[in-house]
């Protein structure tokens, strides 16, 4: 069985990392899986870049310019939306030609256009589209926030500051609506929350959507060797000697509005007022505006950006891992934290519900109650959940082999259904 996974990158961004892990997991389970990307960062021979620097740069710039002139020349929302109007046609690539199954992943920003997806679907091969966020079920946005226009046919897009029905979001919505008519296209959501959103979406409400989570594997992490990291770990051990318990929050950009940093600060203030507990917060990731640090009411360490191996190494020294995201498709940092032995605390408003069993393997606070989140921190610090229970919970639900076998079952089901339909048509 030959499978090709398509992604913009193999290692840059959460969706890319999870796609790379899926490829490795499928290979470890006997599937001839390969990965086609624009940006190749790994040395894995099963990953090939189809990049053409000039063409890819031009596609990227053309798409950003199209969005920029339609969103009121706002940089603020420039990367909150994608149109997939520009991208490569890779339907003639040898790996695509050889494939029995094709898996589409995060392929925006000029990597693959909707026309390119159409050309792949025209090959007639079973094609699975993994839904890492809401982009496939909306016109152009990756997260709809409080907008419910995706339950109709978009238009009047708030991210474009549009007062027009036939705006860019509606036109892309129409293109997707035509594309989704192909019977060889199948959708997989990475969480039940994404599937719920699909049921609400006018684009996908009538399409079957399977749920297969992202995977994680202990073997995916390598022992990092970095002097700066060693200093961070030494500092954590010194903090331990002050009897402080250690919390951590990690994100590529901590003050991305979707990550809910203001909510976390409110919750920490409530925690400080209600409970006499020494805590130390680790902030892992970048900050565009470091003035946020002055608003944190307790001791903290700002590590700056760390790579996945370094984040995982740090989490082994943490008691509680936090997420205050307003929207979370899956919650990769939570499962990484649990695998490292951290008790997770998060809101109950997204894919976190697939990860945490409330007050059994973590705490799900009622969104958006900062009070309840503060209580969740207290509960987690007092809990006696063993690290082995947390690790086993992750591996039994999100382990690489578990997830790979779910995909193999999906391949078999698609093949069986196709054979049955052929028999009926005869």
Enumerate the language-model features and the residues they cover.
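Carbohydrate-associated surface elements
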Residues: 193, 215
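A short, well-ordered alpha-helix in the C-terminal region of glycosyltransferases
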Residues: 385-400, 406-409
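Short alpha-helical donor nucleotide-sugar binding micro-motif in glycosyltransferases
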Residues: 306, 313-318, 407
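Conserved acidic donor-binding segment of nucleotide-sugar-dependent glycosyltransferases
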Residues: 358-359, 363-370, 378-384
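Short hydrophobic beta-strand element within catalytic cores of glycosyltransferases
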Residues: 343-346
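Conserved donor-binding/catalytic core segment of Leloir-type glycosyltransferases
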Residues: 188, 238-259, 265-268
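Aromatic "clamp/platform" in nucleotide-sugar-dependent glycosyltransferases that forms part
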Residues: 326
């Amino acid at each position: 069985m030959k499978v090709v996974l398509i992604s913009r990158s193999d290692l840059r961004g959460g969706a890319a990392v999870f796609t790379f892990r899926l490829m490795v997991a499928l290979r470890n389970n006997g599937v001839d899986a390969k990965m086609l990307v624009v940006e190749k960062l790994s040395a894995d021979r099963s990953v090939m870049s189809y990049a053409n620097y000039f063409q890819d740069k031009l596609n990227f710039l053309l798409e950003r310019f199209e969005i920029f002139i339609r969103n009121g020349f706002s940089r603020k929302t420039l990367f909150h939306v994608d149109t997939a109007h520009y991208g490569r046609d890779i339907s003639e690539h040898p790996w695509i030609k050889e494939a029995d199954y094709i898996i589409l992943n995060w392929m925006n920003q000029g990597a693959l256009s909707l026309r390119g997806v159409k050309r792949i679907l025209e090959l007639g091969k079973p094609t699975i589209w993994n839904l890492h966020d809401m982009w496939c079920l909306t016109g152009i946005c990756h997260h709809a926030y409080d907008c419910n226009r995706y339950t109709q046919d978009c238009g009047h897009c708030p991210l474009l500051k549009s007062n027009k029905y036939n705006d860019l979001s509606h036109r892309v919505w129409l293109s997707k609506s035509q594309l989704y008519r192909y019977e060889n296209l199948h959708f997989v959501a990475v969480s039940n929350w994404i599937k719920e959103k699909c049921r609400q979406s006018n684009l996908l409400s009538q399409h079957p959507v399977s749920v297969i989570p992202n995977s994680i594997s202990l073997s995916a992490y390598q022992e990092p060797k970095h002097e700066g990291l060693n200093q961070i770990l030494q500092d954590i051990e010194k903090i331990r000697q002050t009897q402080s318990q250690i919390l951590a929050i990690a994100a590529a950009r901590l003050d991305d509005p979707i990550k809910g940093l203001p909510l976390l600060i409110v919750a920490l203030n409530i925690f400080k007022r209600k409970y006499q507990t020494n805590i130390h917060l680790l902030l892992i990731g970048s900050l565009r505006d470091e003035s946020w640090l002055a608003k944190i009411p307790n001791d903290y360490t700002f590590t700056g950006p760390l790579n996945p191996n370094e984040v995982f190494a740090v989490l082994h020294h943490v008691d509680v891992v936090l997420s205050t995201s307003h929207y979370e498709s899956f919650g990769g940092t939570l499962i990484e934290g649990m695998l490292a032995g951290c008790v997770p605390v998060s809101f109950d408003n997204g894919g976190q519900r697939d990860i945490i069993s409330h007050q059994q393997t973590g705490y799900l606070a009622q969104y958006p109650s900062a009070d309840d989140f503060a209580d969740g921190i207290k509960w987690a610090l007092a809990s006696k959940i063993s690290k082995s229970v947390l690790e086993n919970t992750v591996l039994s639900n999100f382990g690489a082999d578990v997830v790979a076998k779910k995909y193999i079952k999906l391949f078999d089901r698609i093949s069986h259904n196709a054979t049955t339909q052929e028999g009926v048509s005869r």
